[in-house]
A protein has these predicted regions:
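Polytopic alpha-helical membrane-helix bundles and their juxtamembrane interface segments
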Residues: 1-237
Length: 237
């Protein structure tokens, strides 16, 4: 683990970079590679480092899983943002895979952060696993049923439309599981922070999807920083 001063630098870096990004975005309204590719994704990557070295996360696999989840999201963002600025395109499947990997990794990390007594953890482990299975099953079924009708309202291939449904469904699952853990752990403060981060991230996702559906989304909008704020709060939990 890092010493106190190095960790303090790592921990403060995401927020400092976010503030710089917001200020530059206000000054420069037009998208630029430095602000929206390099700086934007640097916030997410430093948030991943902060989560990995966090002394609050005593469970090693929880740190690794949460950090990897944020790294994969940052990779997905980097791939898609790169394509917006340069002619050398990354295959869209790369960003889709990276974004999709965010959800199971974050769910696994959330489960591993349980701070309950080991005996109590064993008692509720089966309940959480059942909840995850049911949640993913119902979500997958709903996404499949919605796919046909969504094709008439969203542009793009069947895969892109399906992913546009799966991503917010994944957000909802994360919120639901976090709320369940809050109830099981009687309002653990870390889970409140996790819920806040997931809620901010989810709200940004839904807002992005809504704007995209009515063709009003503007690339590199200041509202995109909601994703970064959510990830920073998650890394602090």
């Amino acid at each position: 683990m890092l010493g106190y001063r190095p960790y303090l630098i790592v921990r403060c870096s995401p927020l400092a970079l976010l503030i710089i990004h917001l200020l530059l975005r206000i000054v420069h309204s037009q998208p630029t590679a430095i602000i929206d590719l390099l700086l934007f994704n640097s916030v997410a990557l430093t948030a991943a480092l902060s989560a990995y070295f966090s002394p609050l996360l005593k469970e090693r696999f929880a740190r690794i899983s949460i950090a990897l989840a944020i790294v994969f999201w940052a990779l997905g963002s980097t791939f898609s943002t790169w394509d917006a600025f340069f002619s050398d395109y990354f295959p869209s499947a790369l960003s889709d895979i990276a974004y999709t990997a965010f959800y199971p990794l974050l769910l696994f990390g959330l489960f591993r952060t349980l701070t309950l007594h080991p005996m109590k953890r064993n008692e509720i482990k089966g309940e959480i696993i059942d909840t995850l299975i049911i949640g993913f099953g119902v979500s997958g079924l709903c996404a499949g049923l919605a796919l046909k009708s969504a094709m008439t309202n969203f542009e793009g291939s069947a895969l892109s439309v399906f992913l546009s449904i799966v991503f917010p469904v994944g957000d909802v699952i994360l919120v639901a599981v976090t709320i369940s853990l809050l109830a099981l752990q009687r309002g653990n403060l870390r889970n409140f922070l996790f819920l806040l981060g997931i809620t901010i991230f989810t709200a940004t996702d839904i807002y992005f999807l809504w704007q995209s559906s009515i063709s009003t989304y503007a690339f590199a909008a200041i509202t995109d920083d909601g994703w970064l704020i959510g990830l920073i709060v998650i890394s602090e939990s």
